[in-house]
Amino acid sequence: YPALEYAHLPLVLGPDKKRLSKRHAATSLEEYKDMGYLDSAILNSLARLGWSGGDKEVFYMDDLLKDFNIKDVQKAGAIFDITKLDWLNAQHLANLSLEGFKEHIKPFAHKIDIDINDHPNTDLLIASMRTFENTLYDIARALRPYFMDVGEYDKNAIDKFLSNGTKVLEDIHELLQTISHWNEEEIDVMLKEYQASNNLKV
């Protein structure tokens, strides 16, 4: 029989450069899936451990089959960074079609008793919230208030937090009229600038 071909892969280390363990982060891939990370983002993150694809950061399986070369994998330990996985997952989520995103968010919404179709403007709501967090689980949690029946209001809380609300809404309404390109990025920049200039807390 011909000799087997094999290669050594670098150890996966935590941010402290010690061997990755549960005290650093989850060590089971299933745990990451349960937390709302896409399979493609997890694969992307694993492939990038110890391997550089140049300036390109986001890879899918087809990209890896074409670009990955075991000879380019470094020998030194590779550091796993959860913030990088968060970023990659956000990119993969953003690249999903709206229908694809809805299919992926459904099981996470179901876990917290939400039926995403039980809303008069489901597509608009999902489209506006899909980049709000980095994982499907966190996005589902962020959607929850939109599916809750509001009971009694706390008047003291209203007086405390919404006393200036009308002016803020009027200001933002005027600023929205000045946006030249109506897209999420420009709206987000405008809101953050207004928040900073008026010392508003989220």
Walk through the language-model features, giving the residues of each.
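Alpha-helical recognition segments enriched in aromatics with Gly/Pro capping
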Residues: 1-92
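Structural motif
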Residues: 32-40, 75-81, 115-125, 195-202
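Small-residue-rich helix-loop
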Residues: 98-200
